[in-house]
Amino acid sequence: MARKCGAVKLRSCCDPLFEAPEVGRLVNLVMVSGKKTVAARIVYTALAMLSPDRRRSYELLMQALHNIKPSAEIRTRRMGGASYRVPAEICSKRRMSLALRWLKSAAMRRRERYAHVRLYNEILDALSRRGGAVRQRDEVHRLAHANRAFSHSRRG
């Protein structure tokens, strides 16, 4: 019989300005070589460009992330010597994680000179359902839809 209790969930880091875990996660994703103050300045400047009101800019960020979040993803399942790509539902925590990662990577692929302008423009594009992050989500959904014939072979 197992004697250990379940793993303790660590609280995700909330940022001091917005007191929201999503903004803290975005700051940590943008951070390069441990330079957190530089990353925080990039994220806060981009959010300030969205709206001077903090609450409104946070709501706009959350709406953009909602537009980026995927509802299904492809998992590779090996059966009978062949690998199949099986669509699977995603839990809400992973949805948010993927959305933040895709937002950051799409923003940093953009051509603007400054990082905060790139992030700002990517958030605006996500709000209007355009841009690299939304394109990536649509690609994942397209793959899941194309492979729905294998959805009967999900685990559990």
Swiss-Prot record:
Entry superkingdom: Bacteria
Gene for this chain: rpsG
Xref: InterPro entries: Ribosomal_uS7 (IPR000235), Ribosomal_uS7_bac/org-type (IPR005717), Ribosomal_uS7_dom (IPR023798), Ribosomal_uS7_dom_sf (IPR036823)
The species this protein was found in: Tremblaya princeps
A single GO cellular-component term on record: small ribosomal subunit
GO biological process: translation
Quaternary structure annotation from Swiss-Prot or TrEMBL: Part of the 30S ribosomal subunit. Contacts proteins S9 and S11.
The UniProt record lists the keyword Metal-binding: no
Sorted UniProt keywords: Ribonucleoprotein, Ribosomal protein, RNA-binding, rRNA-binding, tRNA-binding
Protein name: Small ribosomal subunit protein uS7
Cited function: One of the primary rRNA binding proteins, it binds directly to 16S rRNA where it nucleates assembly of the head domain of the 30S subunit. Is located at the subunit interface close to the decoding center, probably blocks exit of the E-site tRNA.
One Gene Ontology term of the molecular function aspect: structural constituent of ribosome
Protein family: Belongs to the universal ribosomal protein uS7 family.
PANTHER family tied to this protein: RIBOSOMAL PROTEIN S7
Pfam families the record matches: Ribosomal_S7
UniProt cross-references to CDD domains, sorted A to Z: uS7_Bacteria
NCBIfam families, sorted: rpsG_bact (TIGR01029)
